[in-house]
Amino acid sequence: MAKVSAVNRNNHRAALVKRDKEKRTALKNIIKDRTLSVEDRFDATLKLAQMPRNGSATRVRLRCKLSGRPRANYRKFELSRIALRDLASAGQIPGMVKSSW
């Protein structure tokens, strides 16, 4: 089990990303638009720099929904390899069977 504070911190970051997504993408589009003046693009760069860092999508870590484990996660299931193995062996994941040959 991961520390509760680490999981809560990550959840808070995800909420900030969701909240600031439109504003960030608008500023990034202004920065990339070569038809605008240099001053407008620079102002957009300064505004983007003033936004909180935790609002960036790269700051959010993919964590297991059950254990909060930050590594070895399957995106499709949003579970760590350990939790996925436990649930699959218990028959909790439909269609997943242990392979044998």
Curated annotation (Swiss-Prot):
PROSITE patterns reported in the protein's UniProt record: RIBOSOMAL_S14
Pfam families the record matches: Ribosomal_S14 (PF00253)
Gene Ontology biological process: translation
Classification via InterPro entries: Ribosomal_uS14 (IPR001209), Ribosomal_uS14_bac/plastid (IPR023036), Ribosomal_uS14_CS (IPR018271)
Keyword Hydrolase attributed: no
Disulfides per UniProt: none
Domain of life of the organism encoding this protein: Bacteria
Signal as UniProt keyword: no
Gene Ontology cellular component annotations, sorted alphabetically: cytoplasm; small ribosomal subunit
GO molecular function, one term: rRNA binding
Record's keyword terms, sorted: Ribonucleoprotein, Ribosomal protein, RNA-binding, rRNA-binding
SUPFAM superfamilies reported for this sequence: Glucocorticoid receptor-like (DNA-binding domain)
Family affiliation: Belongs to the universal ribosomal protein uS14 family.
Quaternary context: Part of the 30S ribosomal subunit. Contacts proteins S3 and S10.
UniProt-listed PANTHER family: 30S RIBOSOMAL PROTEIN S14, SMALL RIBOSOMAL SUBUNIT PROTEIN US14M
Task of the protein: Binds 16S rRNA, required for the assembly of 30S particles and may also be responsible for determining the conformation of the 16S rRNA at the A site.
The protein's name: Small ribosomal subunit protein uS14
